[in-house]
Amino acid sequence: MTTIFAIETSCDESAAAIVRGRTVVASIIASQIDVHRLTGGVVPEVASREHLQALGGVIAACFAEGGLGWADIDAVAFTCAPGLVGSLLMGSMAAKTLALVHARPLVGIHHLEGHIYSAFLSDPALEPPFLCLLVSGGHTSLVAVEDHGRYRILGRTRDDAVGEAYDKVARVLGLGYPGGPAIDKLAQRGDPRAFALPGGRVESPFDTSFSGLKTAVLRLAEKHRLQRLPIDRADLAASFQRTVVETLAERVELALAHTGYDTVVVAGGVSANRGLRERLGQAGPYRAVFPPMHFCTDNAAMIACAGVARFERGFRSSLDLPVQSRLSLEACDSLYQCLPVP
């Protein structure tokens, strides 16, 4: 069974993992949240420096946890796009050095493909085709996963990603960073119908827009402040979350009807949201698959799992593979020097 060692450094987590097949052998994550909380968001230069300081220890701890050596590893996978260039470079240099020193093949992985494969860690029997709702701080997309490595983007956000909207609303409510978990927790105590807020609907049936919703929350909070009226933050958080969740659920149900698929994978950092899990996890005509909670946010286990799928199908990357801040999920094959023969 294929065993992959992987590194993930696309943003503010320094992570390494070993996955055998679809089973996690070891996974280590060094988070930078406490560092970036001081500035209310990720500072790219700071993130790069933190990766540089953490990666050596993270890699050593990963092999120690797994009880394996390089003789057990078939290939090295790493996140090469998209993400913060400086952060990606830290992981790229480490992965390429290890692949070269230990004479192992290299497999570059698209970060969002990694998130899709995080669902395989909770359901090893999962197979395409299925629909994937990718929801994170930087991405909100509906993707038809037609086969392993074959993706068709059905819809995306026109402006703010879901996670970005959560962070901005959290700042308005004085909840700090990161905003997603803070709003999710506060919303459990509030009335989700206390405030009528505009949904994220646009003309395209599968696209979303959350800038109007974010602005509505900002204006509502400002109006109460100017009029010196009390505002229940829990009610506002619950109303905001309900609006987001219903908008996403509507898009998912439309896309499932359009594709004829009966399974939706929900992946990305926002897939940990309790409101979203409850809404999409309700009994219905479709099955919802979520990653394990500890693999919803950025981690290397998902990169390794995607690496297994790519490696077993003959994909290999060059040591010259550059990192890229932006790359469409539909362009994944551009990351590979050796492509399998059809």
UniProtKB/Swiss-Prot annotation:
UniProt EC number: 2.3.1.234
InterPro entries given in the database record: ATPase_NBD, Gcp-like_dom, KAE1/TsaD, TsaD
Gene field: tsaD
The protein's name in its UniProt record: tRNA N6-adenosine threonylcarbamoyltransferase
Annotated family: Belongs to the KAE1 / TsaD family.
Reactions accelerated catalytically: L-threonylcarbamoyladenylate + adenosine(37) in tRNA = N(6)-L-threonylcarbamoyladenosine(37) in tRNA + AMP + H(+)
Keyword Transferase: yes
Native source organism of the sequence: Gloeobacter violaceus (strain ATCC 29082 / PCC 7421)
Recorded superkingdom: Bacteria
